[in-house]
């Protein structure tokens, strides 16, 4: 990679993230930049764990040849090549995160688990329902378009949820994800989440069933408003499928299926 690619803007010399990492949605991480696509909205530990699952950019889906990190000024940085890690890509994060300067992130692990189980839920076309044993616990009202548009904190929660859910649709590239996110955020400022037309308009991009699930899950998410990725994944409020399983129980089931029959079974 040419040096000017890495230093095309003065701000790109920063060792730390300038914007929220698109994987964990936090801004306090160490920046990593991918080659050849150039995307750099990733925390280093996040992208290492992402590549345990796929050697492609989370934004544009292009194959990743090299990762740059540890930036110091305009010309000092570290890098590693994906091909140097051998054929077992599932060892990537274990190899790379041994470095003491990049400690493991529990939040990143939780996000990887969350994406895995969320993809399984969409494949099964399951919608969450409330755990009856927790029905007496506090619930928030689903915000109206006016309430949503006037609350920066609510907008942030909705934006974060939509961003994570759209990552599940592997046929969407980064530009498409960004466009759909902006489109849906604008739509929800003027139209109720539950409105049939909201589903119909989103369905033009990801399909009717998927749109129905996404908006239903967003609605449930806003009713309980978990504080973090971990609290969402570990919540006992959300149950799925005929057995009424939590996301953690589903994750355990997925891992057992893959251990016994191989990863292809997850898609059945």
Swiss-Prot record:
Q: Where in the cell is it found?
A: Mitochondrion; Nucleus
User: What SMART domains does UniProt report for this protein, alphabetically?
Assistant: RING
Instruction: Tell me which residue ranges form RING-type zinc fingers.
Output: 21-61
**What Pfam family does this protein match (any one)?**
zf-RING_2
Q: Which GO terms describe its cellular component?
A: mitochondrial outer membrane; nucleus
Q: Which UniProt keywords apply?
A: Metal-binding, Mitochondrion, Nucleus, Zinc, Zinc-finger
What's the domain of life for this entry? Eukaryota
Instruction: State the Gene Ontology terms under molecular function.
Output: SUMO ligase activity; ubiquitin protein ligase activity; zinc ion binding
Mention one GO biological process in which this protein takes part, according to its record: proteasome-mediated ubiquitin-dependent protein catabolic process
This protein is called: Uncharacterized RING finger protein C16G5.03
